[in-house]
Swiss-Prot record:
Entry annotated with the keyword Cytoplasm: yes
Family according to the record: Belongs to the eIF-3 subunit B family.
Quaternary structure (record): Component of the eukaryotic translation initiation factor 3 (eIF-3) complex, which is composed of 13 subunits: EIF3A, EIF3B, EIF3C, EIF3D, EIF3E, EIF3F, EIF3G, EIF3H, EIF3I, EIF3J, EIF3K, EIF3L and EIF3M. The eIF-3 complex appears to include 3 stable modules: module A is composed of EIF3A, EIF3B, EIF3G and EIF3I; module B is composed of EIF3F, EIF3H, and EIF3M; and module C is composed of EIF3C, EIF3D, EIF3E, EIF3K and EIF3L. EIF3C of module C binds EIF3B of module A and EIF3H of module B, thereby linking the three modules. EIF3J is a labile subunit that binds to the eIF-3 complex via EIF3B.
Protein name as annotated: Eukaryotic translation initiation factor 3 subunit B
Compositional bias ranges of the Polar residues kind: 73-93
N6-acetyllysine modification, residue list: 198, 277, 353
Entry-linked Pfam families: eIF2A (PF08662), RRM_1 (PF00076)
Organism: Mus musculus (Mouse)
Compositionally biased tracts (Low complexity): 1-11
Region ranges (Disordered): 1-147
Amino acid sequence: MQDAENVAVPEAAEERAEPARQQPASESPPTDEAAGSGGSEVGQTEDAEEDAEAGPEPEVRAKPAAQSEEETATSPAASPTPQSAERSPSQEPSAPGKAEAVGEQARGHPSAGAEEEGGSDGSAAEAEPRALENGEADEPSFSDPEDFVDDVSEEELLGDVLKDRPQEADGIDSVIVVDNVPQVGPDRLEKLKNVIHKIFSKFGKIINDYYPEEDGKTKGYIFLEYASPAHAVDAVKNADGYKLDKQHTFRVNLFTDFDKYMTISDEWDIPEKQPFKDLGNLRYWLEEAECRDQYSVIFESGDRTSIFWNDVKDPVSIEERARWTETYVRWSPKGTYLATFHQRGIALWGGDKFKQIQRFSHQGVQLIDFSPCERYLVTFSPLMDTQDDPQAIIIWDILTGHKKRGFHCESSAHWPIFKWSHDGKFFARMTLDTLSIYETPSMGLLDKKSLKISGIKDFSWSPGGNIIAFWVPEDKDIPARVTLMQLPTRQEIRVRNLFNVVDCKLHWQKNGDYLCVKVDRTPKGTQGVVTNFEIFRMREKQVPVDVVEMKETIIAFAWEPNGSKFAVLHGEAPRISVSFYHVKSNGKIELIKMFDKQQANTIFWSPQGQFVVLAGLRSMNGALAFVDTSDCTVMNIAEHYMASDVEWDPTGRYVVTSVSWWSHKVDNAYWLWTFQGRLLQKNNKDRFCQLLWRPRPPTLLSQDQIKQIKKDLKKYSKIFEQKDRLSQSKASKELVERRRTMMEDFRQYRKMAQELYMKQKNERLELRGGVDTDELDSNVDDWEEETIEFFVTEEVIPLGSQE
């Protein structure tokens, strides 16, 4: 064997064999290790490529080594067959004996190779000198030994190639049947054909059509044949349910579906009962006795993630894991799930032990979004997708884990690409001159068509109803406009025309009671930009609009979540001011208060309203102002140097400021404050990255019940005050608890001692001759009388002199 492998082949033989080989001549044979277990996977890939190039005859085999040189020279043995595909592609045979030896090593049959070398044609060592003398070399043989059994199927070996193999088709795969087509006569048939062709040619080239007729009219159904079965499938997917007019809605099916539906068994098979997977109480944290909230913390530059209970003194750790996520985490809108990011997809966790609830495979996922109802999850990956299988954006069903639909993503899009309605029944996306609105659970277009809106720039859903707002810029003499549309009827309930518009921003109040359109304008005859706040009162008839104009630069705008006030930061540093406005019931917008010389660039309202934090983040060194808007007083002014984030807890009782390692590499920590601006905690975490409060679902109490609780608040306040006194300090709380435990232990011991004392009473009576010494007056002789005298001094003081 070794001699056969070391024999060199003349250059002339290599040059003649070169056209027949597909491997480059510069490649060297692999070692035994590479030809053995390590070369199988590579060999499969390379041979699959060679099979694709070899043509439609994958069963052609190499001629046996026993053939003559003439037969070998004329045989098509250049390309390896699928049966010998396990041979490493880097092997370049230099002689028949060597080719057989290396080939047998790659297949893992060394004994068979030895038999081939010692066959009837002589050994490889004898064959090669004869070839050298004649100046020629035999072509290599790739044939298998007689006792070789190939137990690898073509599907396992060349599955990626065979899936693209042409398949036989009888032509009906490209035919669709369209029902509910208008029945027309010959005079209108041509017009109907034009309409049908216009609708269905969007999905592919139509090569044939057939309109059955009866009594001089069409029968109401037609047959269309596409150039490709894929086009037919696309037509069924998108045109089924297409509404032609009020009386005709198309029903589209593949022609091959008739066989499928006609062969359905009449016997009903009872489906197997799926075992119920108990996930536990996914909202357990809402039953916490002290009504504490939870929050997640990522630190050590993302290597560790922890979940804490929020406690006034010190946070209480619930769960901590290493490498729980690869980037960041996100809570679902109602706090049921915690989403973690991984290279291969998204995982959802929940329950008291934070077990994995669901996972979604999406390679390279970077962004996600939940529907407000927590029924659907949207994932985005920047990896390239194909026209036939869009994978950039995928919508998943959270309960089942199934993929609902995939979408393409334009490079210029901004996240979130899909925006959800308040109840999760609709979601929409904006493309060039188009607003596409989809409905759940079908994930199809509403009414099977998109809205054509020329020049649409932005849109936003109302948080309190299925109303969508969008704006369109000016086009020559046509003014810009803001439109409010009711869905699913698509009725325009309000249109507002605007002039000299530069830009618009849409701001909804949390309950959907108001919409503010921030309009940047350049009025004629003036220099600079003027900002108008167009306030739409959504709960009133015909949606009246009020306007507030400001000529200063606008830094930030924010609505009070549960109220009718809004705040505006305006001006330029160092003269930045904040103004608070109130929208009255009569429509008048009143300026409540304006604070000058503020170091702030962001507004953070409490989730319950009334209280607001004005923060100067990042470049403004973390200046903080805590304001009570009920009387517009500044409760406290503080600073968290280089603060990058501010997060209110869901109840509005606490607020967290933090310095993230993602934005600033030193002094990474998060501080806990009360809503009044009193600092409670300073929590320093190594390379702290992110803190997120766990959201709470909407309350189940009615407005009347909430009013009653507020009315009886004094009754509950005594209990709360007592708890507050006990928890004023950690030391006092521990001391009281220790004393309470000692007192309870003493009471139990005293009770046990009294019971034992009473059990021993009869024994005491016997020992004392029947005298009950338990009573003090049981023996009068034992009494001793003692008299105690107290000396009293009497002093008389006259009240006045006697005359």
